[in-house]
């Protein structure tokens, strides 16, 4: 014999979503810092310097929603114009810029966190604009005189989404080492990853990327840290679009060259809901509960597609579009430039939720849920 009981269930956000991560210690953001290369140029200035006259290519640059980018342009040739640097010179450029910008971003980040180099216990470096062995982490440790006992990791070649992959790694390290400071450092010398062949394919890439480095300090087990805590990650690789974004060897150009399929903004947008729904699954949260969206500044069309498919407002992505306008696409560290702007804005309140979103080769979408 049974009794039927009428029940009404109301799903509310969990008071402490840290249980979702399965971690006994929750990682919090402790500080952020950014750096760029020495010189910036408007899109018109780049076109004039590179002597680009093709109206279609000029239109790509001038309709990119980018005002300025920090770039280290090719050297001038004796007869005027610019020299197309060989791959060896580009690798040297990457090493010099990535280390310089990375050191400055790291120092700014530690200052923001109220910490010093001697407090650093784990350094995870991210780059895709060049290849280094020993890795960028080793070079920066030597350059800044960081304790050689500092543990380190390098994420290389994952592209624009890699900053969140690194945060996932360092958040796990942080939870296992409460009270110790870890840093995610993204350093991308996009000026070292170009090809000049007059085609529309390379024009799109050359119009988009800029040099930049961003560092994020994290720590667990210290409730005094005011930054948001990391609650959950979600990842999705669109295997049918594996070749839609890639950085590989161009035999005709005798160098590495980046390829972006024209359909990639729509591919990313069409799959954004899948990842967002997985991220919020089991939390009791809806997308409308998210107060702050920090999306990778991948390009005007990519941002527009994400906005439409996730039902966001232009205000939601104001930092994303602002970073694109002022810097261009900074690859793996773009979302941290946006986070820095949000932190400086001072509008977050305790209990607010935020979503970090990056997109890159694979084609890949990464997301993280955070709470202040």
Curated annotation (Swiss-Prot):
Active-site feature positions: 160
A Gene Ontology molecular function term of the record: acyltransferase activity, transferring groups other than amino-acyl groups
Result, substituting residue 160 to S: Reduces the formation of DPA-CoA. Slight decrease of the affinity for malonyl-CoA
Annotated GO biological process: antibiotic biosynthetic process; polyketide biosynthetic process
Annotated pathway: Antibiotic biosynthesis
CDD domains: CHS_like
UniProt-listed Pfam families: Chal_sti_synt_C, Chal_sti_synt_N
First-tier enzyme category under EC: transferase
Effect of gene knockout: Cells lacking this gene are unable to produce balhimycin.
UniProt xrefs under InterPro entries: Chalcone/stilbene_synt_C, Chalcone/stilbene_synt_N, DPA-CoA_Synthase, Polyketide_synthase_type-III, Thiolase-like
Keyword annotations: Antibiotic biosynthesis, Transferase
Catalytic activity, EC: 2.3.1.246
The reaction(s) this protein catalyses: 4 malonyl-CoA + 4 H(+) = (3,5-dihydroxyphenyl)acetyl-CoA + 4 CO2 + 3 CoA + H2O
Family under the similarity heading: Belongs to the thiolase-like superfamily. Chalcone/stilbene synthases family.
Name of this protein: 3,5-dihydroxyphenylacetyl-CoA synthase
Native species: Amycolatopsis balhimycina
């Amino acid at each position: 014999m049974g009794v039927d009981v009428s029940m009404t269930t109301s799903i509310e956000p969990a008071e402490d979503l840290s249980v979702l991560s399965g971690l006994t210690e929750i990682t919090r953001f402790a500080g952020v810092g950014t750096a760029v290369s020495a010189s910036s140029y408007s899109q018109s200035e780049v076109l004039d310097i590179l002597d680009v006259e093709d109206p279609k290519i000029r239109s790509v640059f001038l309709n990119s929603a980018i005002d300025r980018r920090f770039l280290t342009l090719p050297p001038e040739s004796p007869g005027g114009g610019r020299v197309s640097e060989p791959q060896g010179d580009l690798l040297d450029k990457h090493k010099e810029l990535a280390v310089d910008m990375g050191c400055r971003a790291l120092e700014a980040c530690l200052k923001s966190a109220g910490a010093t180099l001697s407090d650093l216990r784990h350094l995870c470096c991210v780059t895709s604009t060049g290849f280094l062995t020993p890795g960028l982490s080793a070079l920066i440790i030597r350059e800044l005189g960081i304790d050689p006992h500092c543990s380190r990791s390098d994420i290389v070649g994952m592209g624009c989404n890699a900053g969140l992959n690194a945060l996932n790694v360092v958040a796990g390290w942080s939870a296992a080492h409460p009270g110790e400071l870890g840093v995610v450092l993204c350093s991308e010398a996009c000026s070292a990853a170009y090809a000049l062949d007059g085609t529309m394919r390379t024009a799109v890439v050359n119009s988009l990327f800029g040099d930049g480095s961003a560092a994020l300090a994290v720590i667990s087990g210290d409730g005094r840290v005011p930054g948001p805590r990391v609650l959950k990650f979600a990842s999705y690789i669109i295997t049918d679009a594996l070749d839609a974004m890639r950085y590989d060897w161009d035999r005709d150009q005798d160098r590495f060259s980046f390829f972006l399929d024209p359909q990639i903004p729509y591919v990313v947008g069409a799959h954004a809901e899948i990842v967002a729904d997985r991220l919020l699954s089991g939390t009791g949260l809806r997308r409308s509960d998210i107060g702050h969206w920090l999306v990778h500044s991948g390009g005007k069309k990519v941002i527009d597609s994400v906005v439409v498919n996730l039902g966001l407002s232009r205000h939601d992505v104001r930092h994303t579009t602002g970073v694109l306008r002022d810097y261009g696409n900074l690859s793996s560290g773009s979302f941290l430039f946006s986070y820095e702007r949000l932190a400086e804005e001072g509008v977050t309140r305790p209990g607010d939720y935020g979503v970090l979103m990056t997109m890159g080769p694979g084609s890949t979408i990464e997301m993280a849920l955070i709470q202040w």
